[in-house]
Every structure is written in structure tokens, then in C-alpha cells.
Design a protein with these regions (language model features):
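Alpha-helix C-terminal capping segments
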Residues: 122-124
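Extended, composition-driven regions rather than compact fold-specific motifs
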Residues: 1-103, 126-282
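Glycine-rich nucleophile elbow surrounding the catalytic serine of serine-hydrolase chemistry
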Residues: 109-119
Length: 282
């Protein structure tokens, strides 16, 4: 049986200081590496509730490979981090000065994890958020148009930080990657009013934008630039050009056309896709 990467770093003979804290249906682990850069990541639905023992927080290996310090937030299910114990614990970390210790703090996640990154970013004033296909809330009195995640909707949305748009004034910069063809994702981004919002339209990538970028071997480069605060929209769109050769892109666009009564355009689009891929492989 293997052990998680974070444990190898902070077990008694490990190279770094750190901790692991279990909090009911959540857990937090911390690895202290680079004194200048802390990255805080949040589970998404793919990882949340995983029962295997060798479980790492989202992007653990990527962050370790870059030598950055890491605070990883685990979820035991589709909780959307609506848990008073977790909220209090992260607030206490702020009060103890953990986030203030670092010159640069970035928070990152995808879907549910992106909500977490946006919801808690204000605990580290001046921080950067890297959010892939985020929700801003699942409170149905605020966002009745997003009913995709019924287990998330059942969480306690009366808890603090349940509408991220109310807590962004101290955040430094927000990179938001989303597919504008996914109506709910687009509407969540439209709710974010921030002077340093960098909207990154990932047309055809669908809700699982981070997964598709990983298949394109672009996710690490995009995340690295965003965490450092150097990523530009033009660079993102340049790196996203190869999406037109990814099968998920083709299927997402075909679904989009069909849903809008334009299925007559699907055969032509599919032929163009196949010709483009054949030309690349020739």
C-alpha cells in the first residue's frame, strides 16, 4: 500500500515541516517549502470522498515539483466546503499569521474547488485566485439558474462565505477559466465584479476545462503563469489553440450546436475536425 506524497514530505524523517489536520468531513494538510509562495488548493468532485489511503490534495505533485509551499483542503464528499469547523479553522490560520508569512499566496481549484478558492481568498489579502469553471454560490435564492449539483445545493448555504461575490474586495487578481457556451458557468463569471478579473474563455472545453487543458499538456504552464500572476489573455488563447484537435472539444461543440437547433452544421464541423487531425498526423 502506497502513502500520499504529502506524507513523504512531512513524516518524521521528511524533508519539510508541516501538518495534517482532520476536521470531520474535511481535512487540511500543510507543507512548508518556499518561504515566498504559498499555494492553497481545494478538492473538486473527482477527488472529494476518495477512500484510498494514498490521497493527495489537488495539484500536490505540480506544486511540489515547483518547490512551492502548499496548503491542501480535502473534502469527504460534495460539500462545497460548507462546514463551520473548516471555516473556523481556516480563519484561525489567518489569525495565527500563516498567510501573512508569505509574500505571495495563490488559491486554486476547479468547479467545486474553484468555489472554495474564491470563497476563502479574502483570508489572504492580495492573493491571486486561479479558478477553473467556478461556481459563485449554489444558494438557490441567489442562483436559481444553476441546478446541476443537487448534492451541493443541499449543503448549508447560510454559513459564512457562501456567496463569493461578497468577499472579493481584498483579493488581488482572479483568473477565471470557463466555457462561455456553458450557460451556468458564464452566468457565474458574470456575477464576479472585480477590477482585476481576468476572464479566460475556453470555448468548447466544457465544464471540465482543467481536465481538457491537462490532456493538451497546457494545464501546468497555464497554472504556473497564473500563480505567478504573469499569465495574459493572449498567452492563454495561444496555449488553448490546440483544443480544436481534442475529441472532447468536438463532442462539446456538436452538443452545443444540437441543443441550439443547428444540428445541420454538425456533419460539416465533424468533417473539418477529422481533416484537421489527419493533417496534423500526416
Amino acid at each position: 500500500m502506497g502513502v500520499p506524497l504529502w506524507y513523504k514530505d512531512i513524516f518524521p524523517q521528511g524533508e519539510f515541516d508541516g501538518f495534517y489536520r482532520k476536521l470531520g468531513n474535511h481535512a487540511v494538510n500543510y507543507i512548508e517549502r518556499d518561504p515566498n509562495q504559498l499555494v492553497i488548493t481545494f478538492d473538486n468532485l473527482a477527488e472529494a470522498g476518495g477512500r484510498h489511503y494514498a490521497r493527495d490534495a489537488w495539484a500536490t505533485k505540480f506544486i511540489g515539483d515547483n518547490g512551492w509551499s502548499h496548503l491542501g483542503i480535502f473534502a469527504g464528499g460534495p460539500t462545497w466546503f460548507r462546514d463551520q469547523r473548516l471555516i473556523d479553522y481556516l480563519s484561525n490560520l489567518k489569525a495565527e499569521g500563516l498567510f501573512r508569512h508569505y509574500a505571495n499566496v495563490a488559491l486554486a481549484g476547479t468547479s467545486m474547488g474553484a468555489f472554495g478558492a474564491l470563497a476563502f481568498a479574502h483570508l489572504a489579502p492580495g492573493s491571486t485566485v486561479v479558478a477553473f469553471s467556478p461556481q459563485t454560490t449554489l444558494n438557490q435564492s441567489i442562483a436559481p439558474w444553476d441546478r446541476r449539483f443537487w448534492k451541493g445545493m443541499k449543503q448549508d448555504w447560510s454559513l459564512p462565505y457562501s456567496d463569493v461575490t461578497q468577499h472579493l474586495d481584498q483579493v488581488g487578481k482572479i483568473y477565471a477559466v470557463y466555457d462561455p457556451y456553458i450557460e451556468q458557468d458564464r452566468m457565474h463569471i458574470e456575477r464576479i465584479q472585480h477590477p482585476n478579473l481576468v476572464p479566460l474563455k475556453a470555448i468548447g472545453l466544457g465544464h471540465k476545462s482543467a481536465m481538457v487543458l491537462r490532456r493538451m499538456d497546457q494545464l501546468k504552464l497555464i497554472m504556473s503563469g497564473a500563480i505567478k500572476g504573469t499569465l495574459t489573455q493572449s498567452e492563454f488563447y495561444q496555449r488553448n489553440r490546440d483544443r480544436k484537435n481534442v475529441l472532447v472539444y468536438r463532442r462539446n461543440i456538436e452538443e452545443y450546436l444540437t441543443e441550439r437547433g443547428k444540428e445541420h452544421r454538425v456533419p460539416r464541423f465533424r468533417r473539418a475536425f477529422k481533416l484537421r487531425r489527419a493533417a496534423r498526423e500526416a
